[in-house]
Regions:
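Active-site beta->alpha N-cap acidic-glycine motif
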Residues: 22-142, 252-253
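Catalytic domains of cell-wall/extracellular-matrix polysaccharide-remodeling enzymes
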Residues: 110-216, 220-238, 242-243, 249-253
Length: 254
């Protein structure tokens, strides 16, 4: 009987997870740099899961983030870039992987006008990012990505037309990639430059009522307040009974 109940619980959870990273989300008025999605929820979704994800690094703030994650024994997923600002910190990618965290693709340039000019331009950007990562990690093992601005961003329409994201999502899956957005946004990389307390409030607001949380954070040079907030963010989710995992581990529950 216990096995039957457990199997039923996992079936419900996996259905929710599948909807979270493979569904067409309604666009919101949220700025594209902090694009949110509506999480699928279920009354019987157990266990409660949270994925901490960090975009746009590595940077000087990546190391203290890794130290906090190590101290708290919490895994995370890093959607990395290879911009000029990242160049001196690229060796940290090896440290991220060595610590047991997940490396995933974000963008080589993070310049919307370039990466969304066409589908070919997007995949050239991904190729450049993979090449930048080759000295530090097994790029063949990386099969997750996050679209800059999210999978339903509208800024891409200016450069590649209204249908470009739909095409890119289909192409990503054809190429063997998983892609994922988020449903909890720290807003730590916005122009308002929130302090640590506000970052935590933003997360608590978005996480409320969700049993599966994918949290958007950043590990750029400008997000020192994220480092300050991280211990309290982790404490909050622990107090709420969440289990921490990478996005790949979440998908593996299927």
């Amino acid at each position: 009987l216990a096995a039957v109940v457990l199997a039923a619980m996992l079936t419900v959870l996996c259905g929710i997870i599948h909807q979270l990273y493979h569904r067409e989300y309604a666009e919101t008025d949220t700025p594209n740099d902090c694009f949110t999605v509506s999480a699928a929820t279920g009354e019987n979704a157990l266990p409660k899961i949270v994925c901490l994800t960090f975009d746009d690094g590595p940077s000087k703030n990546t190391t203290p983030i890794l130290e906090i994650l190590d101290r708290e024994q919490v895994p995370a997923t890093f959607f990395v870039c290879a911009q000029d600002a990242n160049e001196n910190y690229m060796p940290l990618v090896a440290d991220i992987a060595a610590a047991g965290h997940q490396i995933a693709l974000h963008s080589a340039t993070h310049q919307y006008s370039k990466i969304y000019a066409s589908t070919d331009a997007f995949w050239q950007d991904m190729k450049a990012l993979r090449q930048a990562l080759e000295p530090y990690v097994d790029v063949e093992s990386i099969d997750w990505l996050r679209f800059p601005g999210g999978s339903t961003n509208t800024v891409s329409h200016r450069y590649g037309g209204r249908g470009i994201m739909k095409t890119l999502k289909a192409q990503a899956e054809d190429k063997g990639y998983h892609w994922i957005d988020w449903n909890v946004c720290a807003e730590d990389a916005t122009a308002s430059h929130p302090n640590a307390a506000q970052i935590l409030r933003n997360i608590r607001r978005d996480a409320d009522g969700h049993d599966t949380c994918v949290v958007l954070l950043h590990d750029t040079k400008a997000t020192g307040q994220t480092v300050k907030a991280l211990p309290d963010i982790i404490a909050y989710f622990k107090e709420q009974g969440y289990t921490f995992c990478t996005v790949a581990q979440m998908e593996a529950l299927k």
